[in-house]
């Protein structure tokens, strides 16, 4: 009896496996794409949670180590530099040695991959981006985790595609976009912003059709569910419930948008210019590049010890600044300090994003503007926090040129949907002036520079073979 049961079970198992293989091998099967998109979303969500916990673990141990010697002033300063320098050097070395495409934000790499202009080598990008990001973000460098999550999410999508042997180009494109959107959603607990980011920021690369958009929706839903299982459903940035902006104050938000419209292109020029400076300093030499990264990381460690608000990604700073706990002068000082540290950290090629630092910069300048307006117009009883929220999305809109994503992202992260009108006005003003001043979207410009460098290297190799 048992000898008959075992073969019968095996036959049934083989039949199920054959049905699954047949389903997955059918070309242009929407159900298959949606199933793979679901798996991509789950894996991207798990990667997002793991990355967040890993960075927090490294940061906590670094701070705990410094606390052990807090009673010895000279030693705590020395160790603050050394701990952060060593962590940063790990990140820089991993990128330079094993996966150069994992440096920086990673979002331009995904944009290039969607156009089949940049390769996706998930087997090396995923570990390098994860552990390299643990080093640089754990060191206290002014970087965010959203860029790494977008790149890791996109690479997870390609990994799923390769595992299940889907050779068609449309499936490759769809799962890459799905993973990127799921990664952003998992980084910020912002599902709608993840969807809009693909549609708006990657509008020139994304193939918008019914199947692809359903896949993006599915992946984002799954990654957000995974995020909320581990982290709960509360907003990522808790600034409290702010009051709505009266109609007669809306012109102030337009003025704030104009300010950010001037700041955005200037910020982009600083980033791109500093990238050129760093390229000239290290000249492609790995040792110089890693030592330079260690010096920047160590400086961030010292800065975090002296003024914690000036270092780190900035998520912890945003609620404090929005609550009006700083003076206008202090807000402007921290803003300038963080502009410098953001530009240095991001332009150096460290594995880390720039979304979170830009959100913090927008909060600082917006809060300073709001406090100044509250002093100028005391009869209106203005709340500086509303300007801080508007500023969060405005710098993103002016720099990245994705105003809708900036608006929705901030509203989802802060749970202040009643501020949608002042947010729209501020982001529109910022985008229009940035465009009028000739500013180019940051990620598109970085991608163009990467492609130009790639073409120059290919040409040099071709010339070398011909000689």
UniProtKB/Swiss-Prot annotation:
<feature type="short sequence motif" description="Selectivity filter part_3">
    <location>
        <begin position="353"/>
        <end position="357"/>
    </location>
</feature>
<feature type="transmembrane region" description="Helical">
    <location>
        <begin position="251"/>
        <end position="279"/>
    </location>
</feature>
<feature type="transmembrane region" description="Helical">
    <location>
        <begin position="122"/>
        <end position="139"/>
    </location>
</feature>
<dbReference type="InterPro" id="IPR023861">
    <property type="entry name" value="Cl-channel_ClcA"/>
</dbReference>
<feature type="topological domain" description="Periplasmic">
    <location>
        <begin position="375"/>
        <end position="384"/>
    </location>
</feature>
<feature type="topological domain" description="Cytoplasmic">
    <location>
        <begin position="165"/>
        <end position="174"/>
    </location>
</feature>
<feature type="intramembrane region" description="Helical">
    <location>
        <begin position="191"/>
        <end position="199"/>
    </location>
</feature>
<feature type="binding site">
    <location>
        <position position="355"/>
    </location>
    <ligand>
        <name>chloride</name>
    </ligand>
</feature>
<feature type="transmembrane region" description="Helical">
    <location>
        <begin position="353"/>
        <end position="374"/>
    </location>
</feature>
<feature type="transmembrane region" description="Helical">
    <location>
        <begin position="420"/>
        <end position="436"/>
    </location>
</feature>
<feature type="transmembrane region" description="Helical">
    <location>
        <begin position="286"/>
        <end position="307"/>
    </location>
</feature>
<feature type="topological domain" description="Cytoplasmic">
    <location>
        <begin position="348"/>
        <end position="352"/>
    </location>
</feature>
<comment type="subunit">
    <text>Homodimer.</text>
</comment>
<feature type="intramembrane region" description="Helical">
    <location>
        <begin position="107"/>
        <end position="114"/>
    </location>
</feature>
<dbReference type="GO" id="GO:0015297">
    <property type="term" value="F:antiporter activity"/>
</dbReference>
<comment type="function">
    <text>Proton-coupled chloride transporter. Functions as antiport system and exchanges two chloride ions for 1 proton. Probably acts as an electrical shunt for an outwardly-directed proton pump that is linked to amino acid decarboxylation, as part of the extreme acid resistance (XAR) response.</text>
</comment>
<feature type="transmembrane region" description="Helical">
    <location>
        <begin position="328"/>
        <end position="347"/>
    </location>
</feature>
<feature type="transmembrane region" description="Helical">
    <location>
        <begin position="75"/>
        <end position="98"/>
    </location>
</feature>
<feature type="topological domain" description="Periplasmic">
    <location>
        <begin position="308"/>
        <end position="327"/>
    </location>
</feature>
<dbReference type="InterPro" id="IPR001807">
    <property type="entry name" value="ClC"/>
</dbReference>
<keyword id="KW-0868">Chloride</keyword>
<keyword id="KW-1003">Cell membrane</keyword>
<feature type="intramembrane region" description="Note=Loop between two helices">
    <location>
        <begin position="400"/>
        <end position="402"/>
    </location>
</feature>
<feature type="site" description="Mediates proton transfer from the protein to the inner aqueous phase">
    <location>
        <position position="201"/>
    </location>
</feature>
<keyword id="KW-0050">Antiport</keyword>
<feature type="binding site">
    <location>
        <position position="105"/>
    </location>
    <ligand>
        <name>chloride</name>
    </ligand>
</feature>
<protein>
    <recommendedName>
        <fullName>H(+)/Cl(-) exchange transporter ClcA</fullName>
    </recommendedName>
</protein>
<dbReference type="GO" id="GO:0005886">
    <property type="term" value="C:plasma membrane"/>
</dbReference>
<keyword id="KW-0812">Transmembrane</keyword>
<feature type="short sequence motif" description="Selectivity filter part_1">
    <location>
        <begin position="104"/>
        <end position="108"/>
    </location>
</feature>
<feature type="transmembrane region" description="Helical">
    <location>
        <begin position="31"/>
        <end position="67"/>
    </location>
</feature>
<comment type="similarity">
    <text>Belongs to the chloride channel (TC 2.A.49) family. ClcA subfamily.</text>
</comment>
<feature type="intramembrane region" description="Helical">
    <location>
        <begin position="385"/>
        <end position="399"/>
    </location>
</feature>
<keyword id="KW-0472">Membrane</keyword>
<feature type="topological domain" description="Periplasmic">
    <location>
        <begin position="140"/>
        <end position="145"/>
    </location>
</feature>
<dbReference type="InterPro" id="IPR014743">
    <property type="entry name" value="Cl-channel_core"/>
</dbReference>
<feature type="transmembrane region" description="Helical">
    <location>
        <begin position="213"/>
        <end position="230"/>
    </location>
</feature>
<feature type="binding site">
    <location>
        <position position="354"/>
    </location>
    <ligand>
        <name>chloride</name>
    </ligand>
</feature>
<dbReference type="Pfam" id="PF00654">
    <property type="entry name" value="Voltage_CLC"/>
</dbReference>
<feature type="topological domain" description="Cytoplasmic">
    <location>
        <begin position="1"/>
        <end position="30"/>
    </location>
</feature>
<feature type="topological domain" description="Periplasmic">
    <location>
        <begin position="68"/>
        <end position="74"/>
    </location>
</feature>
<feature type="binding site">
    <location>
        <position position="443"/>
    </location>
    <ligand>
        <name>chloride</name>
    </ligand>
</feature>
């Amino acid at each position: 009896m048992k000898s008959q049961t075992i073969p019968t079970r095996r036959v049934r198992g083989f039949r199920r496996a054959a049905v699954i293989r047949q389903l997955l091998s059918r070309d242009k099967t929407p159900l298959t794409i949606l199933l793979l998109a679901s798996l991509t979303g789950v894996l991207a969500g798990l990667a997002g949670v793991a990355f967040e916990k890993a960075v927090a673990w490294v940061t906590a141990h670094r701070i705990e180590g410094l606390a052990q010697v807090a009673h010895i002033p000279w030693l705590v300063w020395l160790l603050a530099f050394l701990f952060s320098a060593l962590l940063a050097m790990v990140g820089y070395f991993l990128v330079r040695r094993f996966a150069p495409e994992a440096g920086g934000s990673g979002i331009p790499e995904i944009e290039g991959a969607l156009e089949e202009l940049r390769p996706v080598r998930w087997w090396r990008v995923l570990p390098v981006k994860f552990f390299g990001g643990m080093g640089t973000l754990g060191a206290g460098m002014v970087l965010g985790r959203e860029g790494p999550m977008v790149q890791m999410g996109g690479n997870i999508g390609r990994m799923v595609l390769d595992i299940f042997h889907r050779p068609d180009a449309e499936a490759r494109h769809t799962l890459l976009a799905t993973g990127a959107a799921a990664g952003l959603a998992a980084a910020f607990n912002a599902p709608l912003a993840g969807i809009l980011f693909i549609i708006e920021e990657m509008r020139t690369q994304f193939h918008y059709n019914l199947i692809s958009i359903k896949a993006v929706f599915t992946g984002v839903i799954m990654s957000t569910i995974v995020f909320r299982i581990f982290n709960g459903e509360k907003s990522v940035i808790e600034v409290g419930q702010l009051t709505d902006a009266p109609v007669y104050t809306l012109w102030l938000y337009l003025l704030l948008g104009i300010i950010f419209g001037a700041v955005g292109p200037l910020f982009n020029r600083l980033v791109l210019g500093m990238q050129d400076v760093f390229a000239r300093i290290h000249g492609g030499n790995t040792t110089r590049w890693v030592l330079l990264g260690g010096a920047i990381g160590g400086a961030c460690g010292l800065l975090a010890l002296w003024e914690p608000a000036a270092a780190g990604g900035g998520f912890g700073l945003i609620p404090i600044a929005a609550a009006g706990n700083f003076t206008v002068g202090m807000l402007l000082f921290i803003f300038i300090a963080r502009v410098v540290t953001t530009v240095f950290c991001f332009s150096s090629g460290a594995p880390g994003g720039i979304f979170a630092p830009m959100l913090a910069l927008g909060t600082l300048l917006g809060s300073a503007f709001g406090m100044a307006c509250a002093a100028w117009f005391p009869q209106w009883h203005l709340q500086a926090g509303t300007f801080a929220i508007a500023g969060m999305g405005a710098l993103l809109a002016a720099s990245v040129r994705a105003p809708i994503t900036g608006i929705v992202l901030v509203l989802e992260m802060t749970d202040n949907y009643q501020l949608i009108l002042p947010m729209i006005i501020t982001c529109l003003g910022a985008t229009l002036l940035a465009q009028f001043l000739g500013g180019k979207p940051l990620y598109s410009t970085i991608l163009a520079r990467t492609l130009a460098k790639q073409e120059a290297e290919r040409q040099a190799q071709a010339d070398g073979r011909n000689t």
